[in-house]
């Protein structure tokens, strides 16, 4: 923590980035308190105040139907952050598990899981997400699941490559000789070495 703060203190760009992230997260979390027109996040129509330029009442102006753009942006932050957090919370564990199993267990696990991953990777991500949404009801939850289907293969491929490179290392062989289970080797020995790459991919 101290090292991170020291880096931020000596690097203006890092500090600026951290402040921008803090502003976005703060705006999303406290949107109900900050937004001057919280009711404008929904299907509100106000043709008296449509297309207004920024002023003291409407900080960023209004849209075509009179809704305050600043309020809507704050609530959009909330939806975007929630989407990102939920998608990562589902996609990363799936992708990591698939990659570890295929890379470490090998044989038909490798062939079956990686061919499944290749099928998903062969489809353009946005096309895949839109195709899924075309088959189900267009809700936020279904949207999250569609994006999850788009993202997990990338983590699977990343962890698979790392696992293939690590499984013959001395520390892995030592754990196997000592009688460690496959799950222990995968999640306690190999996975920690993949965490930096996973975190980089997540951000």
Language-model features: locations:
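Gly/Trp-centered helix-boundary motif
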Residues: 1-96, 100-101, 107-111, 122, ...
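Conserved RecA-like P-loop NTPase ATPase core
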Residues: 8, 175, 194
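Membrane-helix interface/capping residues of multi-pass secondary transporters
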Residues: 13, 107-108, 140, 180-182
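Low-polarity contexts
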Residues: 19-22, 175, 182
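Generic hydrophobic transmembrane alpha-helix motif, especially the helices
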Residues: 59, 63, 69, 90-94, ...
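Helix-loop-helix units of permease transmembrane domains in multi-pass membrane transporters
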Residues: 72, 171-178, 186
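Transmembrane alpha-helices
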Residues: 78-94, 183-203
């Amino acid at each position: 923590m101290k090292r991170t703060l020291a880096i931020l203190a000596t690097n203006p760009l890092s500090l600026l980035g951290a402040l921008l992230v803090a502003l976005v997260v703060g705006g999303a979390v406290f949107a109900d308190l900050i937004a001057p027109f919280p009711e404008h996040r929904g299907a509100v129509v106000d043709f008296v105040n449509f297309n207004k330029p920024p002023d003291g009442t409407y900080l960023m102006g209004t849209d075509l139907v009179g809704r305050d753009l600043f309020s809507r942006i704050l609530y959009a932050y909330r939806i975007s952050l929630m989407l990102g957090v939920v998608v990562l919370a589902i996609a990363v564990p799936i992708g990591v598990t698939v990659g570890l199993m295929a890379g470490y267990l090998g044989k038909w696990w490798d062939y079956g899981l990686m061919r499944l991953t290749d099928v998903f990777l062969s489809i353009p991500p946005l096309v895949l997400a839109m195709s899924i949404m075309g088959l189900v009801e267009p809700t936020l939850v279904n949207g999250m699941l569609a994006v999850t289907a788009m993202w997990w293969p990338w983590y699977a491929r990343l962890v698979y490559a790392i696992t293939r490179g690590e499984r013959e290392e001395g520390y892995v062989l030592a754990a196997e000789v000592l009688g460690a289970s496959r799950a222990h080797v995968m999640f306690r020995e190999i996975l920690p070495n993949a965490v930096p790459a996973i975190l980089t991919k997540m951000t």
